[in-house]
């Protein structure tokens, strides 16, 4: 990684390096997660690994950092943990993640659903 080691870094991938628990999607995860994991562990400044591919939101600790998977902007995958369940779409809202660094170098992530929703309403 050519980035300076004294600043936090984000690594972006399409395929997650970790299992999601959804067998049909895990069959298509990153091919060499251990090789990437060794690089991630070598650097102490990897704040987050950001991915897509799962078509649903997921967060998991891995190799000293957090893997954050964004929802899809097209369709979401049905959450099925049983083996031999074929992948299926579900009509959950599409969405995206918005990541930003605050003034204290903390990475803050919001998940935003895309669609037409009532509101905003006063909140007390």
Roles of regions detected by a PLM:
Residues 39, 61-124:
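Binuclear metal-dependent phosphoesterase catalytic core
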Residues 1-66:
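His/acidic metal-ligating clusters that form di-metal
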């Amino acid at each position: 990684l050519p980035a300076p080691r004294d600043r936090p870094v984000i690594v972006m991938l399409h395929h997650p390096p970790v299992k999601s628990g959804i067998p049909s999607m895990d069959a298509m995860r990153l091919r060499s997660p251990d090789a990437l994991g060794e690089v991630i562990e070598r650097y102490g400044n990897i704040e987050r690994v950001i991915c897509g591919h799962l078509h649903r939101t997921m967060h998991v600790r891995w190799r000293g950092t957090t893997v954050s998977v964004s929802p899809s902007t097209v369709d979401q995958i049905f959450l099925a943990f049983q083996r031999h369940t074929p992948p299926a779409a579900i009509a959950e809202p599409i969405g995206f993640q918005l990541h930003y660094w605050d003034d204290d170098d903390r990475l803050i992530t919001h998940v935003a659903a895309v669609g037409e929703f009532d509101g905003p309403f006063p909140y007390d």
